[in-house]
Amino acid sequence: MKPLIMLICFAVILLQLGVTKVCQHNEVQLGNECCPPCGSGQRVTKVCTDYTSVTCTPCPNGTYVSGLYNCTDCTQCNVTQVMIRNCTSTNNTVCAPKNHTYFSTPGVQHHKQRQQNHTAHITVKQGKSGRHTLAWLSLFIFLVGIILLILYLIAAYRSERCQQCCSIGKIFYRTL
């Protein structure tokens, strides 16, 4: 009987790990809650609950929103760099080396093309979100857990020890 109790506990734990809350397209996941997003240039100062809405605060001048909760100081380009884009409340300053044609910042790929009059054109491509990857990974872990649970139950009921002590095991063993 102890293996069955342990197996049930294991299944409950796997179910808890495998269940992920999926928010609607117009919501963001904050902890275990799905909340409406903050406005542009604002950070989360208090997470929503079932009874209250999310509380947002604008980032002060000279900072930009970094993630959902933080305002980060804007980067200052140094003397060996050229400023490509000014810092705003939603995006950091984009700096590039004066003599290079390619550069990158985390999560964003940039390509700078110099023309004869030394103006720059930038193409920006955002990185992909990891939310779908997390959902698929959770589903995979859940399914592997269920398969292991089924295999364990079959092995337990087929064992001689279980057949001798459990009438259910004898019935189950005969049907397989």
Swiss-Prot record:
Keywords attached to this Swiss-Prot or TrEMBL record, sorted alphabetically, are:
Activation of host NF-kappa-B by virus, Disulfide bond, Host-virus interaction, Membrane, Repeat, Signal, Transmembrane, Transmembrane helix
Biological process (GO) annotations held by this record are: defense response to Gram-negative bacterium; defense response to Gram-positive bacterium; negative regulation of alpha-beta T cell proliferation; positive regulation of cytokine production involved in immune response; positive regulation of T cell migration; symbiont-mediated activation of host NF-kappaB cascade
Q: Does the UniProt entry include the keyword Ligase?
A: no
Q: Which regions are annotated as TNFR-Cys repeats?
A: 22-56, 58-95
Cellular component, GO, one term: membrane
Membrane topology per the entry is: Single-pass membrane protein
Subcellular localization(s) per the UniProt record: Membrane
- Specify the superkingdom: Viruses
According to the record, the signal peptide region is 1-20
Question: By its UniProt entry, which InterPro entries does this protein fall under?
Answer: TNFR/NGFR_Cys_rich_reg, TNFRSF14/UL144_N
Provide the disulphide bond pattern. Answer: 23-34, 35-48, 38-56, 59-71, 74-87, 77-95
Q: What is its main location?
A: membrane
Residue intervals passing through the bilayer: 134-154
Q: How does it assemble?
A: Interacts with host TRIM23; this interaction causes auto-ubiquitination of TRAF6, leading to NF-kappaB activation.
UniProt function note: Activates NF-kappaB in a tumor necrosis factor receptor (TNFR)-associated factor 6 (TRAF6)-dependent manner, causing the up-regulation of the chemokine CCL22.
Protein name, please?
A: Membrane glycoprotein UL144
